[in-house]
């Protein structure tokens, strides 16, 4: 489908170069309907096969428009009931896209008649509402397909609504419902801009949203005023936590670094020292600059197909059911658009040229001053980066570069789900996996430990019946069945896998009424997850089965009333029914499985028995040093390292306010460190086959490399000299790799550049013994 629009020359235009044909985005298993951006001018669209325009009566136009509007609204509402998994939702989305395309073209063609107050009186805010729903359609299609092209399309519509001021006169019309729709539009637009790293637009939108919220509460004094204040507070907290890098420089603004695209925002200010402060944002989508490629002749293979991101932690920074950690993992699981990647490539080459000139000048001055003294410790090792760029150019010439479009893995974002919802999405993701494809589960949740007496009550029956045999409750015969619980009670693996777990969203407060540690406020939180309609049938079947079982047990109990029967379901352990245990994941390990856990109970996944399939788990520290807890306002530290190792390194050592020149230098040093780790991984002969399998995938390789970088940083940092502060993996990585001198020296180069040697141990300095599992 192709739609041609005429663009006016007024200030309402989306872009000055918008006089072109809008080509629909083609994607596999995607809707083909593509709608052009809103246009302020009255546009008449005619088919190329029509020789003359067809005259239509105004009454017929109004009747057709109302019919299309009602039908589109009905279809739009119906999309909420579609499950997020499977493929049955695709034809419904395609039908909705096509109808909204028809509706938008129709109102463009007959805009003058529809806006005539004597005929219909279509308001500009109503046009904006239609455009807002089209943008929302694209956004939800992005969530279901992980294709960032649809996210860009959503941004185009949302931006056009703002530039053409479709909601400008909402406050004058004094229609509270339309004002609420305007506020929701701003909230959705902010989410889209956050996902696209358009922070400059975000700051502008926040100012406008704050003004509109104040107007809304002042005029109508609504009951939901506090809810909108909470929305603003969440946005402010989210942006403050996501402000990864702040530069202080007197002469120059930050340049593009190899970590991603640096974008200046409007939050520039001058401090008391006269330094110019630039708050910047980095794009952390994957590209060949922040993820080293496999060595020749190996090539990257798309192994990761399904990803489930779970955020279920208390007091986590979030906005619109997306926590900061989920947001960062989402960014890390998407490829950077090719145009931006090429731009970063060119900028990096310019940086390398400038650094080489600087090094030559410094070397000449040092040689003249020190009579030829070796100054290798003060130079930037840019040679590996040059080799990397040369390798990338060869790959592109061979057709392995930009000529092949790589797909993002399909993602499910689950905010505070129940255990049944997690298992449901794991099952459908497992079902969709192809041959030699992998599934990733990232879960950030609080951990818990059952008390020893609770565990004993759960495992062992009362002492009065431990050594007895009880008659069978299945039939009326006198067959005796011995109770064998000794093996369960003394099984260390059972105690390891079931005495700890991860707390999820508690949906039934009655189950946790005896637990003093449960926060019942969690029950008010809703999860953006749709349960399939088959649940009703399953519930009915379960109810019938329960009734039958109760009758049978009642009959049998009357004949054996003298036998004490222990009711296991009344044990205090049942208060943790809404929890995730390691054994819950075992059935899904029949196919390649990649697990990332960020929790103080992450160690329980360190001994998970698996099938003969590739399996890797990256586990966070069990605790964070007390001196760093108060400074961690940027989300969970382990996830921060997997997302942006450079900013995370700065966060635990020197803070995030550093000169831009220093940040450019440490970015290149960190890139060199990641290159070293990548090279050692592929050269390691003792590497577990599971790691070797996952290393060929770009996303999983980047997580493994950043995990080793995180391990080396914690290993050398003075505050992390305890086993509970160390990251772990299952299967364990070889010690020859984790403690390789080349990796540790590259970390020390970063330490020297940041001048934080007092916080790190030397390479030959004694450290506490860290026990590796």
From Swiss-Prot:
Of the GO CC terms on this record, one is:
nucleus
Give the species.
Dictyostelium discoideum
Cross-referenced InterPro entries, in alphabetical order? Answer: SCAI
What the record says about family reads:
Belongs to the SCAI family.
The record's subcellular locations are: Nucleus; Cytoplasm
Location, primary (coarse class)? nucleus
Lineage, top-rank taxon, reads Eukaryota
Q: What does this protein do?
A: May function as a transcriptional cofactor with a repressor activity.
Cite the record's Low complexity compositional bias ranges. Answer: 1-23, 35-50, 258-274, 353-364, 383-397, 514-532
Positions of the UniProt region annotated as Disordered: 1-51, 250-280, 353-408, 513-532
Gene Ontology terms: biological process: DNA-templated transcription
Task: Name it.
Answer: Protein SCAI homolog
Q: Which UniProt keywords apply?
A: Cytoplasm, Nucleus, Repressor, Transcription, Transcription regulation
State where composition is biased (Polar residues).
Answer: 24-34, 372-382
Which Pfam family is one of those matched by this entry? Answer: SCAI
Name the Gene Ontology molecular function terms of this record: transcription corepressor activity
